[in-house]
């Protein structure tokens, strides 16, 4: 694999922490998100727009119980996406998850957290691609607008944040462009 996965043990630790919250959690295994009907049937309660709901339905495989599926399939997890119904839980959950070793926590939306194995970042992906294509770091450029783009904006020869992006992205970028 290109980047490390979160081990099965660590994935179960993450999911067992997250299940204590009013949250929709989707681990990714073999490039597909895994979800359960109680999440899919109530996506609006987790703040997902109609467009996001369509994307989720198209990219998730349904199982009766996500955690039981992860336990039984015994495969490492590529990523865990979490959508929270109560926004005040986001930073509380982030703090609780920060005790899990070997993971990085980021966010791409106002109501989500994304858990990846340490080292599985957009910045590392950009540098891998540049090396694969024979391009120097200085000759790379990246655009971003959110927390999950920070490593990429910092890694790129030129990092450009969107004018309507989050402050954390703007601070990581070399330049800020129009919206």
Residue ranges of model-derived segments:
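Generic structural "secondary-structure junction" signal
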Residues: 5, 72, 115-117, 164, ...
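Conserved acidic, metal-coordinating active-site core of Asp-based
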Residues: 13-17, 21-143
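Short, small-residue-biased leader/transition segments that mark boundaries at the very start
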Residues: 1-8
């Amino acid at each position: 694999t290109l980047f490390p996965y979160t081990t099965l043990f660590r994935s179960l630790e993450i999911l067992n922490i997250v299940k204590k919250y009013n949250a929709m959690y989707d681990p990714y295994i073999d490039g597909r998100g895994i979800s359960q009907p109680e999440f899919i049937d109530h996506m609006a309660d987790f703040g997902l727009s109609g467009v996001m709901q369509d994307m989720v339905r198209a990219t998730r495989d349904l199982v009766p119980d996500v955690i039981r599926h992860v336990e039984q399939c015994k495969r490492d997890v590529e990523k865990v996406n979490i959508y929270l119904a109560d926004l005040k839980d986001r930073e509380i959950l982030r703090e609780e998850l920060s005790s899990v070793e070997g993971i990085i926590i980021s966010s791409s939306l106002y109501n989500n957290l994304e858990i990846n194995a340490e080292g599985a970042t957009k910045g590392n992906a950009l540098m891998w691609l540049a090396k694969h294509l024979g391009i120097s770091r200085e000759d790379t450029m990246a655009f971003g607008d959110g927390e999950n783009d920070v490593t990429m904006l910092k890694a790129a020869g030129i990092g450009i944040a969107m004018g309507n992006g989050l402050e954390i992205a703007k601070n990581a970028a070399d330049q800020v462009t129009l919206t």
